[in-house]
């Protein structure tokens, strides 16, 4: 599976890493176009710079706070963002227009992202199966916590390594109207927040400045995988060999 990056479409794309101090397009909400849905300051819209061919690239602006993040949001705000994001992701999946739909978040200079303003990306792949290289073993491992049908594992067979934490909940709880499922969805959001805070503030002495957060539907579960990001190991780049520590 190979995605095609169109360099012409990337021309003029803002980049806080290479060109810091520029105007943030996500702060100027009055100028945003192609908005699909909004809920307060949470906005789902079509990505202006759709650089991948045969895809539909969309953005979820999480908050009006330019420097906000999962690690710093108040608990209720983080829960609301997760519910909104899951509903947007599932709407694209239910449309049936895509072979697969991916949702993920970049944070920090080593994450692969270009803008500081907090956002997630929801990308529909028209022809490719984004899960083709994944296996259930990538999401299992050492159990470290469980409550209210939510559990947390540390991968013993990571996708990339070195350290990948999985937060696992029953699929569909965020869309359910039942009080039990609502409690589970909140627990899911809270667990993700705890893991992200750990990755940024405690893991490796708090030296991580970047992370990725990936979402998957796997075998009746929704999984959030948190990865601290460092310079990528040559073992993975050249040989696809993951490492653990």
Descriptions of predicted regions:
Residues 1-115, 123-187, 195-245:
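Active-site microenvironments that recognize anionic phosphate/pyrophosphate groups
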């Amino acid at each position: 599976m190979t995605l095609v990056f169109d360099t012409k479409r990337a021309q003029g794309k803002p980049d806080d890493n290479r060109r810091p101090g520029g105007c943030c397009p996500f702060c100027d909400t009055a100028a945003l176009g192609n908005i699909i849905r909004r809920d307060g300051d949470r906005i789902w819209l079509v990505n202006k710079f759709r650089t991948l061919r045969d895809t539909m690239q969309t953005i979820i602006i999480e908050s009006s706070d330019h420097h906000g993040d999962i690690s710093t949001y108040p608990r209720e705000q983080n829960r609301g963002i997760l519910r909104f994001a899951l509903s947007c992701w599932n709407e694209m999946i239910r449309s049936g227009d895509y072979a697969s739909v991916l949702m993920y978040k970049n944070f920090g200079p080593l994450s692969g992202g270009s803008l500081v303003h907090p956002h997630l990306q929801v990308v529909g792949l028209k022809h490719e199966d984004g899960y083709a290289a994944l296996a259930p073993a990538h999401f299992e491992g050492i159990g470290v916590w469980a409550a209210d049908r939510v559990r947390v594992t540390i991968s013993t067979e990571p996708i990339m390594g070195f350290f990948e934490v999985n937060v696992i909940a029953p699929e569909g709880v965020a869309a359910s109207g039942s009080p039990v499922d609502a409690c589970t969805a909140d627990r899911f959001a809270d667990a993700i927040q705890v893991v992200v805070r750990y990755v940024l503030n405690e893991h490796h002495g708090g030296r991580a400045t970047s992370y990725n957060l990936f979402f998957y539907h796997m075998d009746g579960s929704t999984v959030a995988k948190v990865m601290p990001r460092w310079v990528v190991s040559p073992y993975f780049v050249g040989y696809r060999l993951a490492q653990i520590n």
